[in-house]
Amino acid sequence: MLKLYHAPMSPNSRRVWITLLEKGLEFELVEVNLDGEQLKPEFLAMNPFHHVPVLEDEGFHIVESIAILDYLEAKYPAPAMLPKDAKDLAIARMVQMVTINELLPSIGPLFPLMLGFPGGDPEKIAQAKQKVSIVLKFFDDVLDDRPYFGSENITLAEPVAGTVIPWLAKADVSLSEFPKLSAWRDSLLARPSWQATEASLEALKARMATRMPQQKPG
Ligand SMILES: N[C@@H](CCC(=O)N[C@@H](CS)C(=O)NCC(=O)O)C(=O)O
């Protein structure tokens, strides 16, 4: 059986978890405590870079969440989660890569806000929100009259972008200017796979508090 080594609070793991659920696959979840378990020799033997997720399939270990999503799509093609049309495939990939290369690196200053911690550098927060708004506009423009990126059905773009964008509301980043993206987010949040994998805000706060001992949740 497929085995997913994950951490409930890791968005990179959650992409894979959601995809396994959306594909209706049987799998075992193995939780890795990122307070050190990832540095143990048994885990490093699977992933020398000490990151979750890792997918194990009959002794074969795959690291890097996007490589895992591609593996699942190739091995379990139904339901299809990557468009076949060239433009639509490019759209799904662009959304994955823009999330990883543009959105995620820009939101660091927003994390404390998302988790309800006070403070933060107002200039850095404003800069982060400006970068985020460029990504949101890009995504809204890329969505056409279909509900998902390049598709009538959920694609591998959704577990990547759709596990980041809903959290932005917690940092007062509104999607009201982006009606297509807002409808897209709402439809994802209603899916059982999103609901089953949502990390608890309290657990995230507790984890963040151990890393930022000088701050208390507001
Ligand atoms: N590029 C990797 C990133 C994985 C990653 O950064 N995982 C984090 C959790 S979100 C992790 O395992 N951190 C613990 C560590 O690096 O020791 C992927 O997409 O799978």
Label each region the model flagged:
Residues 200-218:
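Acidic/histidine-enriched, glycine/proline-rich intrinsically disordered or flexible terminal extensions
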